[in-house]
């Protein structure tokens, strides 16, 4: 089982914590990570693109000139696709790009992401993370104590409003709960700062 240092909010090493091999100690599967990131990014797409077809473009109800006798090619509407300003054939319509990978693949992806952070030595485990009031200054101090000076993902066991409000104005810092942890967030941040209680919750679900 991988062992990592356990810190308090002052940045002091107060011991070690054993992480579950099945969650934090597997060989990261790069292809599964790739598939999971593509899935998440697809779900974030708005899908609000839209073009008008010949029935929706304004105008064009009248035949532009008579069928025969002008010497020009026959035309039925100035809004047919070959005309400038005409309708678009088979253009994009609003749609959802979201899809889901199988549950086993999604679980393997998050375990691979967490294990990669352990291998990179980019995981910081806190014994507890509590703030008496929402103070950005206090959160910055805690992160400095832990030598976290880059993009960081903070994972708490449950939603903590003081922690969320204290971190929301810090560039590159994101707060999620153990139940909301996802591959894109883990890979998109340099450091993973996770509380001991959150570790236990993640292991309970994924082990």
Swiss-Prot record:
What are the start and end residues of every segment in region (Disordered)? Answer: 45-78
What is its biological role? One of the primary rRNA binding proteins, this protein initially binds near the 5'-end of the 23S rRNA. It is important during the early stages of 50S assembly. It makes multiple contacts with different domains of the 23S rRNA in the assembled 50S subunit and ribosome. Forms part of the polypeptide exit tunnel.
The transmembrane segments are none
Q: What is the lineage of its organism?
A: Bacteria, Bacillati, Bacillota, Bacilli, Bacillales
Protein's UniProt name: Large ribosomal subunit protein uL4
GO function term, MF aspect, one: rRNA binding
- InterPro entries linked to this entry: Ribosomal_uL4, Ribosomal_uL4-like, Ribosomal_uL4_dom_sf
What protein family does this chain belong to? Answer: Belongs to the universal ribosomal protein uL4 family.
Q: Which UniProt keywords apply?
A: Ribonucleoprotein, Ribosomal protein, RNA-binding, rRNA-binding
Q: Does the keyword Ribonucleoprotein apply?
A: yes
Pfam families given in the database record: Ribosomal_L4
One of the protein's GO biological processes: translation
Key word Ribonucleoprotein present: yes
**One cellular component (GO) term of this entry:** ribosome
Q: How does it associate, per the subunit comment?
A: Part of the 50S ribosomal subunit.
Native source organism of the sequence: Anoxybacillus flavithermus (strain DSM 21510 / WK1)
């Amino acid at each position: 089982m991988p062992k990592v240092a356990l810190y308090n909010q002052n940045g002091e090493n107060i011991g070690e914590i054993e992480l579950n091999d099945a969650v934090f100690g597997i060989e990261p599967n790069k292809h599964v990570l790739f598939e999971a990131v593509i899935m998440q990014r697809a779900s974030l797409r708005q899908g609000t693109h839209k073009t008008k077809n010949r029935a929706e473009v304004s105008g064009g109800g009248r035949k532009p000139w008579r069928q025969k006798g002008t010497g020009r090619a026959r035309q039925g509407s100035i809004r047919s696709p070959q005309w400038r300003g005409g309708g678009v054939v088979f253009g994009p319509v609003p749609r959802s790009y979201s899809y889901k990978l199988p549950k086993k693949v999604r679980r393997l992806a998050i375990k691979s992401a967490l294990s990669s952070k352990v291998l990179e030595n980019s995981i910081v485990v806190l014994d507890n993370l509590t703030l008496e009031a929402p103070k950005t200054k206090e959160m910055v101090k805690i992160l400095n104590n832990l030598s976290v000076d880059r993009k960081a993902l903070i994972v708490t066991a449950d939603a903590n409003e003081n922690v969320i409000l204290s971190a929301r104005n810090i560039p590159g810092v994101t707060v999620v709960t153990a139940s909301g942890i996802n591959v894109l967030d883990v890979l998109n941040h340099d450091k993973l700062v996770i509380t001991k209680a959150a570790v236990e919750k993640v292991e309970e679900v994924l082990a």
